[in-house]
Amino acid sequence: MEVVEVESPLNPSCKIMTFRPSMEEFREFNKYLAYMESKGAHRAGLAKVIPPKEWKPRQCYDDIDNLLIPAPIQQMVTGQSGLFTQYNIQKKAMTVKEFRQLANSSKYCTPRYLDYEDLERKYWKNLTFVAPIYGADINGSIYDEGVDEWNIARLNTVLDVVEEECGISIEGVNTPYLYFGMWKTTFAWHTEDMDLYSINYLHFGEPKSWYAIPPEHGKRLERLAQGFFPSSSQGCDAFLRHKMTLISPSVLKKYGIPFDKITQEAGEFMITFPYGYHAGFNHGFNCAESTNFATVRWIDYGKVAKLCTCRNDMVKISMDIFVKKFQPDRYQIWKQGKDIYTIDHTKPTPESTPEVKTWLQRKKKLRKPPKSLQGNKPLCKRPKPEEDEEFAEFSGEEGANPAMGPRHLKVTEKPEKALKLGKLEESSAKEALDTRIQVDQSLLNDTKLSGKGCISSSVTAEIPPEDNRASAVISPSQLKEGADCIPLSHGHQAGKESHLLKILKLESPKIPSPLPESNKVLTEGEENDEEGHGSNLEPGEIPEALSEERNGLNIPKIIEGQPKTTKSWRHPLGKPPARSPMTLVKQQVASDEELPEVLSIDEEVEETESWAKPLIHLWQTKSPNFMAEQEYNATVAKMEPNCAICTLLMPYYKPDSSKEENDSRWETAVNEVVQSGRKTKPIIPEMCFIYSEENVDYSPPNAFLEEDGTSLLISCAKCFVRVHASCYGVPSHEVCDGWLCARCKRNAWTAECCLCNLRGGALKQTKNNQWAHVICAVAVPEVRFTNVPERTQIDVDRIPLQRLKLKCIFCRHRVKKVSGACIQCSYGRCPASFHVTCAHAAGVLMEPDDWPYVVNITCFRHRVNSNAKSKTCEKAISVGQTVITKHRNTRYYSCRVIDVTSQTFYEVMFDDGSFSRDTFPEDIVSRNCVKLGPPAEGEVIQVKWPDGKLYGAKYLGSNVAYMYQVEFEDGSQIAMKREDIYTLDEELPKRVKARFSTASDMRFEDTFYGADVIQGERKRQRVLSSRLKNEYVDDPVYRTFLKSSFQKKCQKRQ
C-alpha cells in the first residue's frame, strides 16, 4: 500500500497523511480504514484518500441540473483580527443550474490568484465581505446504482446499529448529505455529532481547503475559543457544536495550537476522525457528498462526547446499544457509572473484534435486498404551526429549539419506476400543469395507527421556509390543475405518514444592515429602540420563485418497514447581532436617564443617592484623601467577588434591591473580617484584557492562573485594595505577605485615574506616566494593555476626541468639569454614556461579550425594556379592566377586557428528537390527562398528532397560555396575548406612545354614547380626494353609490 508525504509509521508529528490504495485494497472500506489508523493517520484528525483512477462513483454529472437545493443558506460573517462568528440565513430554493450560474457570476466567483496560499490569504482578508450562498445539508446521494466501493450511502460500519436495532435514521449522520459550494462558503470549527468519524467525497468542481487540529490537542482549541467567546461559552459548554466560530490559522499559530492544512481536489476523499476539530472553505463552485460512520474505537469517544445543552434538536445517540453489543464485558460497570476510561488518542482501531464479527455474520443473514438511498427522505414530525413565531427572527433560544435549522416540510413521491437523483427526467411546464394526482382514498382512511409511525400512502411536498414555518393539510382532491407545486424528493418514504402540504408564501428574511465602523456621532433623536435595523437583500440575488420546470408531482408508492427519521443540522441558522460596532461613539444630546439637577459635591450638600454615598470622599474634584481610599478598598474587598477588577462584571450596588437592602449590604461588609490567602475563580475572562490579535507580546492565555482555573486573592499592605493575582498581573514569585500594588510601590498617594472621576480601586500606570483603573482600561474600547499578562503600560492615546467629549449621566452634576473617557450602552444606537466607575458604582449591568467586543453594557432603560415582557406578564388582568393594546389598524387604543381564557399545554420530546411545547393534554392517548393530570416528568407517552397517527414521546413539563378578549370603542373585538397588553399604570414603550390614540373610529357610536351626544359631536363626513377618483376604495357606502350610478346609466342606454 502506497503512503505519501509522511514516513513515520506512527505519525508523531500529527501531520495529515495521504493514501493511494490499489483497487484491491480499495474494495474493503473498514479494512483499509484500520490500515490507515495503523499508520497513525487518525492522530492528525484528518486524512486524504485518493481512490484508484479506474474507480468512478458516477459516470456523468450533466443530468443533475434540475436537482433542487431546497434550503440554500447565506453565510454572513462578523468579526476581525482572525476571530469571526458566522451566521446562516436561509434563502429561497433553487436548482443546481441556478446555483451554478449564481456561483459563477461576477459577484460570487473566485478571484484571480497565484497559488493556493494566495487564495487562502484572500479568503481570510475578504471573509466579512459579500456573503456567499451555500447549498448545504441536502439529504441524498448521487452515486450510481451498483457502486459498492466506498459508497457513502452504505459504508456498512458499526453505526448501522442505530438504524438496524433502534429503527432510527438520522439525516446526514447515517444517511448521506450533498453540498453545493461556491467561493468562500465555509464550514466552521467543529467536531462531528457525537464525535463520530466522517467521510467527504468531492464529486466535481473547484477544490476545498481543510484545516485540522489533532484530537490530542482538541481541548486546547476549546479553551482558546472559550476565552475569545466568553458569552457563547457561558451560554453553552459545547458552543463549538453550533458551528458558528471561525479562528484563523494565524491565531492558532500565535497561541501555539498545532494544526495542519490540506487541499482536497475533485475525485478525492477526506476522512475526519473522532474528536478531530476541522474547518475549511470552498474555492469555487463544487459538489461534495458526506456522511458519518463509526468503528469500535469510536464507542469510547461517544460515551464521553460533550453535547450541546442549549438546543433541543442537536443529535444525541444513545450509547447503550453500542456498549452492550460491542463492549459486553464493560456494559454493567458502564451502566453503574464506574467505567472509568482515559481515551488514548494515539491508539488505532482494530481491524475487527469478536463482537464485530458476530454482528457482521448476523447482519449478512438478515440482509435484505439493497434499497436505494438516493434522494431525499422525509424529515421527522415537527412542532405545530403555532410555534412558527419563534422561528421568525432566527432566534438562538431553545423553547422549541427555534432557529437551529431550516425546518423543511418534506414530500416524498414514488414514481412508476424507481427514480434516482442521477436519472432525473426533465418535464416541461405544460407537462407539469397537465399532471394529475390519483391517490386511492382507502389508503388514507384504512391506515392503522401505531406508536412506531405508519406507512405513507400520501404525496408530500417540500417547502424551504424563510422566516418561519407554516403548513396546512389538504386532501388530494383539493389539488387543482395548474396549481403551483414544488418538486418532490426522489427515493423511498421513511418513517411517518406525511400529508399534502399547502405551500404558503413566506417573506424573505431581513438582514440587519451593518453600521460603519467609524467614529460616527448619533444624536438621541436618531436613537432606535428596536434591536434590529434591517433591510432586504439585494433584489435578484436569489430567484424569487421556483421555475416552471420544477413543477409537477408523481404518483406515490407504499414502502413498508422504514425507520423513523430525524435530522442533523450541519449548518444551523442564526441571526447576526444588531448592535453598535466596538469603536462607534454615539453622542448624547439629552438622555432619558439624566439625573435630576444636583449641586456640586464641592458645596458639601448631603448625597441622597444610595449608590453614591460610599463615594462621597472619592470624587477627584475633592482633595486627595488616602484614608478614605483605604476605607473604601477594605470594605469592598469583603464583598463579592472580592476582587476590585472582577467586580466590573458584579457591581456592589444592586439597583433592583431596595435602599435599605443596599445600605445593609454595605454595613455588613464593613464589619466582616477579610480572609487572606484564599483562591477563587476570576469571573472576568482573560480575553477582556486583549485589545486585538496583534498583541505580539502576549503569552498564552491564563498565564498566572492555577491549573484548576483559580487564582490567589491578594491585598495591598497599604491601600488595602484586593485583587486576584491573575487579574492584576502578579506572577506567583512576587506574591508575599507585604505585597504592594503598583501605585503604593511608587508611593503615589495622590494617584487618580485619567479615564474617570473617582479615586480608589486597582490602578496601573499608563504609557504617558498617568494612572488608570484596570477596569476602566478593560471597558473603554480604544484603551489597550501593551503588556497584557502583567496588565502594564496602558495605552490611552487612541481614544478619539468624540469619546472624550461625552458627558457622564451619573456625575455630570456632581463635578464641575468634564474629564475622563465615557463608555456607552451597547443596545442599538442608544447614546447613554457614563464613566466605567460611575456606571459600576450605580449598578449598570456589564457582561463579557464575544470577540471583537470586550463587554456588553446595558443601561437602566434597556435593562428595563429587556425585562418588561416578563414583568408585564406578572401583573394580573381581570375582566372589565381598561387596558391599552393594538387595534387592527395598527394604532394603539384604550379598550375593555371582556373575557379571559387559559389553556394548558404539555411540552414533549418526540422519539425522533423533535420538540413541541403546545401539545394539548387530550392528545396524550396513553394516559387520561384530563382526569388524572399530567404524567410524571420524563415518562414515556403516546401522542396523537393532527395527522391522525400516534408518536412516541417523552413528557417534559407543562405551561399555561392566557388569551384576553378585548373590545374597542368601535365595537370590534380581538384576542391578545398578555405581553401585547398594557395596563393604565404601566409605562408605555416609546414605540407604543408614538402610535397611541385616544379613541378608535366611532363605527358603532351608539354603543358607548347617547344619540343626543352623537348628533352634536358627530365627525364631519369624509370626502373622497379628487386624486383618488380613479382608485379602488374599500368603502361600502362609496361602492353602493358607484353600483347604483352604474345601473342608472345602463337603464338609460336601454
From Swiss-Prot:
* Pfam families reported in the protein's UniProt record: JmjC, JmjN, PHD_2, Tudor_2, zf-HC5HC2H_2
- Say if the entry is tagged with keyword Iron: yes
> Compositional bias (Basic residues) spans?
361-370
Family per record = Belongs to the JHDM3 histone demethylase family.
Species classification: Eukaryota, Metazoa, Chordata, Craniata, Vertebrata
Q: Cofactor note from UniProt?
A: Binds 1 Fe(2+) ion per subunit.
Amino-acid positions noted as binding Zn(2+) in the UniProt annotation, renumbered to this chain: C236, H242, C308, C310
* SMART domains with a match to the protein in the record: JmjC, JmjN, PHD, TUDOR
Q: What is its EC number?
A: 1.14.11.66
Catalytic activity annotated for this protein?
A: N(6),N(6),N(6)-trimethyl-L-lysyl(9)-[histone H3] + 2 2-oxoglutarate + 2 O2 = N(6)-methyl-L-lysyl(9)-[histone H3] + 2 formaldehyde + 2 succinate + 2 CO2
Q: Where does the UniProt annotation locate this protein?
A: Nucleus
Its required cofactor(s), as named, are: Fe(2+)
In terms of one coarse class, where is the protein primarily found? Answer: nucleus
Query: What gene, per UniProt, encodes this protein?
Result: Kdm4c
Q: What is the designated name of this protein?
A: Lysine-specific demethylase 4C
Zinc finger intervals, C2HC pre-PHD-type: 750-783
The record's section on PROSITE patterns has: EPHD, JMJC, JMJN
**Species per Swiss-Prot/TrEMBL record:** Mus musculus (Mouse)
